[in-house]
């Protein structure tokens, strides 16, 4: 290849640099760079990078605009070596794009960096996009480099290329090897034994005064092999240790996957005492209570809760056989219930006017407990268990206990319909109404002078049914005031009955005009309005038990004739009871 020369002249900082090539053939393995002389000389030089030195090849003569009609190529920036500085980083650098430079005919010396940037396929990719003409000759130049045809530098480049390729392969091999090792460690960790971590409540400070060091792996293996032999160290086992770990002179021996050794416990060695938080756990929910219903002492006071304590020990726990006098059953939030966590033996007044004796009352069920743990309520988990236990007992007692239902409402409000619905849910129930006193064989005849006798007669019938254990006992009266229901509630809680208050859910139950139309006994609107003025909306057992009968209603009345039959029939003919409204 022949040399070509381009004459150049410095025309100024904004003049264009033009060149006219003498030969258009250019190898892709060489790089041409145009450097500006920073000493303000009037020429540019084209240098070729061969090895580590820069060798000047040609001198560019910078001409004026007179060469524009020839085949010229504009140069806009100075192309510096790529590993030193990228094009465009300096404002005074002019990059030569597609400039053709004549080179020597002999094969040039090619540097390793140039080869990697331009021709190596093993490298990630070129940093800059090679010119189009260099792309055409890329395959041929790569073959020259790999085969080393008549070029000692090509052989060296091939060796260096192979060495770099091998280094990359080695790095990849090491990378994948590390990944495999990490995966193996992960699998081994998943397959290893997972020892459960003990809770903070289980730790017992028996390490005090000992050295809390861990055995070395060799000592662990030796100790594992000698576990079946008698040991001279003190054998200590308690709840504070982690599962299947044994302390020996203050040292903890971790167990292995094979649990056959951990279950071996020498019987000839002393065992450390079993230590738990203060107070043993509560008995399970399925312990039995020997409850004797309706077996209270003869003629008990109706305002006192009585219970007999007959405690016995079973499996280390106190289990009480409660002979209970069912004296109270309330759902009112004002009632006071004692807690088992406090040992109370005195008499405490309750919200319903009654007094309760001994420790625990829940929905009319008096439970006597000889032992109560003082720290029971302080323990979160035990408190939850106690709450579940109490709730379970309440639900069970709600099903087992007898029920007294007191209906309330003005005449025509729908009490009769509600009583039939409740009676239909349990055919063993019975309905009592004061209006039954005024029903005769020839029809209903109301007499206001007999109203007191009618109430006494109805209360006696209800008491007989409660004594017989009938449930539910439904009282279908207006019951607009609390004192009217007090006799029924006293008898019911004295026999351990639950007491509930029900009102019909009708939109007209407080509308005198509509009630006048709907009641069956012709009660006037004026009378209904007067009853509505006396109606007590809030009702509970405590309100009933604290109520007082008005003075004008407390006059002594003679008992009604015992042999007198009503339309509703006797107590045995409750299936034919006619449910009516009370005035």
From Swiss-Prot:
GO terms for molecular function: enzyme binding; transcription corepressor activity. The keyword Iron does not apply. Residues 549-575 are annotated as: Disordered. Residues 162-197 form a coiled coil. Keywords: Coiled coil. The keyword Cell division does not apply. SUPFAM superfamilies: P-loop containing nucleoside triphosphate hydrolases. GO terms for cellular component: extracellular exosome; nucleus; transcription repressor complex. It holds the Pfam family AAA_33. GO terms for biological process: blastocyst development; negative regulation of hematopoietic stem cell differentiation; negative regulation of transcription by RNA polymerase II; positive regulation of hematopoietic stem cell proliferation. It comes from the Eukaryota. PANTHER family: NEDD4-BINDING PROTEIN 2-LIKE 1, NEDD4-BINDING PROTEIN 2-LIKE 2. This is NEDD4-binding protein 2-like 2. It comes from Homo sapiens (Human).
